[in-house]
Amino acid sequence: MPQPEGSALLSRPALPAIGITALGVYAPENVVTNADFEQHLDTSDEWIFSRTGIRERRFAAENEYTSHMGVRAVQDLVRRFPHALEGVDAVVCATGSPDALFPSTAALIAGQVGLRGAAAFDVSAACSGFVYACSVAQGLVAGGSARKVLLVGAETMSKIVDQTDRGTAILFGDGGGAMIIEAVPSGYGFESFVLGADSAGAESLYVRCVAHQLPSGAAMQPYLAMNGREVFKFAVRVMGESGHAAMQKAGLSVKDVDWLIPHQANIRIIESACQRFGLSLDKTVVNLDRYGNTSAATIPLALAEAYDDGRIQDGQQLLMIAFGGGLSWGATTLKWYDPLKHAGTAQADQALELQV
């Protein structure tokens, strides 16, 4: 399998000052505990928690879909930052569980939050999708195709997971996060991206629901299938390699990182990645125990939580890493711009002129 060091974007010059200036999140009200699975699966709270680190997760209602997760996350963003949607000219949604193959979930979200006319499209990279979408949004602003991007990571994984399969049912949850990506003052924002994929491992994690891929007369297979052992080995290796590559590209070392925000898939994967970095769990944001694996929404949910409780401070160095179906991986370094601390500043006057 190709190494992340050979991934796209590795040799790009320093990025212009573009970062996150607003954020919001949403998790459904329906809390599903490990004890709930004991009612219909051969499992227990102790068995699930010891192997995954998950205690509970949230499930969307029967009539709620991924666009609903995204819209509610955007509504939370607007509650926090009332003028955040002004001037948004592009909407990007990272999701592996879209409402439909088309129209895009991004288009549905845009229409429901009053952004009709904005460019809107989805990014499909499974659990790596949020990091991929950050790179896409950053590129839209840097290249002049947009001035302000609404980035959403949202999923309803409960609808594409077989709830009778112990190997996958216990892992996944639903939720969404929303962010504004735009120019920020010099010294803040995204510093590096490392993205990659290798379809040699595609059969280890997939949802095959496209009719023409099935043998004649075969039933549709709408549920996620996963080879947990293979995904675990891949994840531990690629998180370490892509994280180091992103830091190297930004001129950073592990000691420069204030917070690691990893994709929340399994506590054992996170612990193994931390060991490879030589990074303490105390410097790692983990909320897996309460939300499970929400795929492209895990990093937004974790980032917002750590920002809300005061762990993430203005100017701190963040490292975000994800892996997922493809098999894919993505890592980015980010100097955090605290939108509340800088509220009311003339951001446009402070930001450097964008040059690609």
Annotate each predicted stretch with a short phrase.
Residues 80, 84-116:
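Anion-binding (especially nucleotide phosphate/pyrophosphate-binding) glycine-rich loop
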Residues 142-175:
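Flexible, glycine-rich active-site loops centered on histidine and acidic residues
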Residues 2-5, 67, 71-74, 97-98, ...:
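Claisen-condensing/thiolase-fold acyl-transfer catalytic domains that form or cleave C-C bonds
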Residues 41-50, 100-114, 151-157, 210-217, ...:
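Acidic-glycine-rich active-site phosphate/pyrophosphate-binding loop
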Residues 73-89, 241-258, 306-311:
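Phosphate/pyrophosphate-binding loops at sites that engage ATP/ADP/AMP, CoA/4′-phosphopantetheine
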Residues 2-62, 165-233, 237, 241, ...:
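Condensing-enzyme catalytic core mediating Claisen C-C bond formation in acyl metabolism
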Residues 31-32, 102-104, 161-165, 329-333:
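Short acidic, glycine/serine/threonine-rich loops at helix termini
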Residues 21-24, 94, 124, 149-155, ...:
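Short beta-strand segments
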